[in-house]
């Protein structure tokens, strides 16, 4: 599904990423690892088409993402380290913000029950805790029909039950042929044989 080929990226004229290459197949999960400042978030932004590399190529389904960036970006969902939640909109409004990209998506109330948030569905998100805001960002992810999930530290600020919920949803996405690329300082609660790791 996704091929990153000999990617280079400079930050302030200094090399940050060099010769990055990997393949992420449909149904695959790749855990990006590295110390703070290693370029994990930058690499996700490059793959999302938000930054341009100095060298190298990114292919999605064997086609350069540069060929039709807009169409490519409709097939991915990027949840950054920050939640990206509008504090002035309600939980429901935040989740439905991009609903035109995902016709036929599962109902918002049903998804809210996964995190026991249904009683907060019409609360402004500015009143939610950091963990709850993170959960709302993940609900938006699950409402999308994106094939490729790019997740930057998705396990941050989640309790154990929420962590197990997101792992289950990731596995369900993979079982349907989707692919997941994530960063995390935490070890994933999965068998090591069930996913790949890439160290920056």
Curated annotation (Swiss-Prot):
The ABC transporter domain, residue ranges: 2-200
Keywords: ATP-binding, Cell inner membrane, Cell membrane, Cytochrome c-type biogenesis, Membrane, Nucleotide-binding, Translocase, Transport
Gene Ontology annotations of biological process type: cytochrome complex assembly
Leading EC class: translocase
UniProt GO MF annotations: ABC-type heme transporter activity; ATP binding; ATP hydrolysis activity
A GO cellular component annotation in the UniProt record: plasma membrane
Subcellular location: Cell inner membrane
Quaternary state and interactors: The complex is composed of two ATP-binding proteins (CcmA) and two transmembrane proteins (CcmB).
Function: Part of the ABC transporter complex CcmAB involved in the biogenesis of c-type cytochromes; once thought to export heme, this seems not to be the case, but its exact role is uncertain. Responsible for energy coupling to the transport system.
Family, as annotated: Belongs to the ABC transporter superfamily. CcmA exporter (TC 3.A.1.107) family.
Protein name, entry field: Cytochrome c biogenesis ATP-binding export protein CcmA
Gene that encodes it: ccmA
């Amino acid at each position: 599904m996704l091929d990153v080929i000999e990617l280079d990226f400079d930050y302030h004229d200094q090399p940050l990423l060099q010769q990055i290459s990997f393949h992420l197949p449909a149904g695959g999960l790749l855990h990006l690892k590295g110390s703070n400042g290693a370029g994990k978030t930058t690499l996700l932004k490059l793959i999302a088409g938000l930054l341009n590399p100095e060298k190298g190529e990114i292919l999605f389904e064997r086609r350069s993402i540069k060929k039709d960036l807009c169409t490519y970006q409709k097939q991915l969902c990027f949840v950054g380290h920050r939640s990206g939640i509008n504090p002035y909109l309600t939980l429901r409004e935040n989740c439905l913000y991009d609903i035109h990209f995902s016709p036929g998506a599962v109902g918002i109330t049903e998804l809210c029950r996964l995190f026991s948030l249904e009683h907060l569905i019409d609360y402004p998100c500015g009143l939610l805790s950091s963990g709850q805001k993170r959960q709302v960002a993940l609900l938006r992810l699950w409402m999308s029909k994106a094939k490729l999930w790019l997740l930057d530290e998705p396990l941050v600020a989640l309790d154990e039950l929420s962590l197990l919920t997101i792992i289950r949803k990731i596995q369900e996405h993979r079982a349907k042929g989707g692919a997941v690329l994530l960063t995390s300082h935490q070890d994933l609660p999965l068998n090591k044989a069930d996913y790949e790791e890439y160290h920056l």
